[in-house]
Each structure stands twice: as C-alpha cells, then as structure tokens.
C-alpha cells in the first residue's frame, strides 16, 4: 500500500512529495473551486507574443487567445475557460475530492476527452489516491506526536 510506504519510510516520503498536500491550510475557497486559472488569471506567452490559456495549448489555433500587442481578442476561449471549475463538471458534483483538485486540469481533460470540460478519469483516480495518502500521512504524523 502506498500510504504504508509513505508513513514507514523517510526516504520514500522525500521521494513522494506529490503526496504532501496541505490538508489544514491550502488555497482559499476561490482557488479550490477555480483551480489554476488558465485562460483567465494567467496565460502562456509564446516567444512570438501569442497568448494561449496554458502552455499545453500553445500551437493549437483553436486556443489562440490573441497577442501581446492587441491583447485578448478571442474572448470565447477566455469565457470557455472561465467556466472550467469544480462545479461546472457534473461528474465532479458528488466527488469528495473536488475542492482539492478544483475539477482537474483542463489540458488533461482536453487530451483525454477532446473537451476542456471533460473529465480525465485516470487523473481523478490518481488525485483521490493522493488525497487518501495525504490524510493517512497526517493521521500517522498526528498520532506519532500525540504518542511522543
């Protein structure tokens, strides 16, 4: 079991930083819902000045948002990304991990399903496992502190 490895081995813990999720703090609720902010809060800028919602969409003409001279001219792409969040995906509605993954990565969803609003199932399963392991590690850490 992954969590047993993580709890039982300092070396394994150092090598598994992706399981180190801040369960008690973390981002504000807005970021927990909206995720990374691709296409709305930040954009990828190419060496030629083109603007894309994320580096993973660079070169795809469908996702070209504009350029650094004219700004965002393709507002439809921005609006599409604005609605990419934990509550916009019906599949996320009842998921216990939605406020940790924020609905997942739009680029991963696009590559898996052809839509930025799709759901990358393998990514969901991996993220839920990360959260489970983080919870297990937190419980073990708190237990070790309590037991001296």
Regions found by a protein language model. Give the residues of each.
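Short, acidic, Ser/Thr-enriched surface-loop or helix-capping motifs
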Residues: 46
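Single conserved hydrophobic/aromatic residue that forms the stacking wall/gate
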Residues: 1-13
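Short, flexible cytosolic linker that couples an ABC transmembrane/permease module to its adjacent nucleotide-binding
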Residues: 28-32
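Short, small/polar residue-rich loop motifs at catalytic or cofactor-binding pockets
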Residues: 36-39
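Flexible mid-to-C-terminal extensions adjoining Fe-S/redox cofactors in radical SAM and related proteins
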Residues: 51, 58-148
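Flexible glycine/acidic-rich beta-alpha junction loops that bind and position SAM and/or redox cofactors
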Residues: 14-26, 56-62
């Amino acid at each position: 079991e992954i969590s047993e490895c993580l709890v039982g081995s300092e070396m394994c813990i150092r090598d598994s930083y992706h399981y180190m999720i801040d369960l008690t703090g973390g981002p504000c609720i807005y970021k927990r819902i909206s995720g990374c902010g691709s296409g709305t809060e930040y954009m990828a800028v190419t060496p030629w000045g083109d603007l894309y919602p994320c580096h993973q969409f660079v070169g795809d003409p469908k996702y070209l948002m504009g350029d650094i001279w004219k700004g965002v001219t393709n507002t439809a792409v921005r609006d599409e990304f604005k609605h990419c969040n934990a509550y916009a995906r019906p599949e996320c509605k009842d998921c216990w991990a939605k406020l940790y993954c924020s609905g997942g990565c739009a680029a991963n969803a696009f590559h898996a399903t052809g839509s930025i609003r799709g759901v990358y199932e393998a990514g969901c399963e991996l993220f839920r496992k990360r959260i489970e392991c983080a919870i297990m590690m937190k419980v073990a850490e708190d237990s070790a502190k309590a037991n001296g």
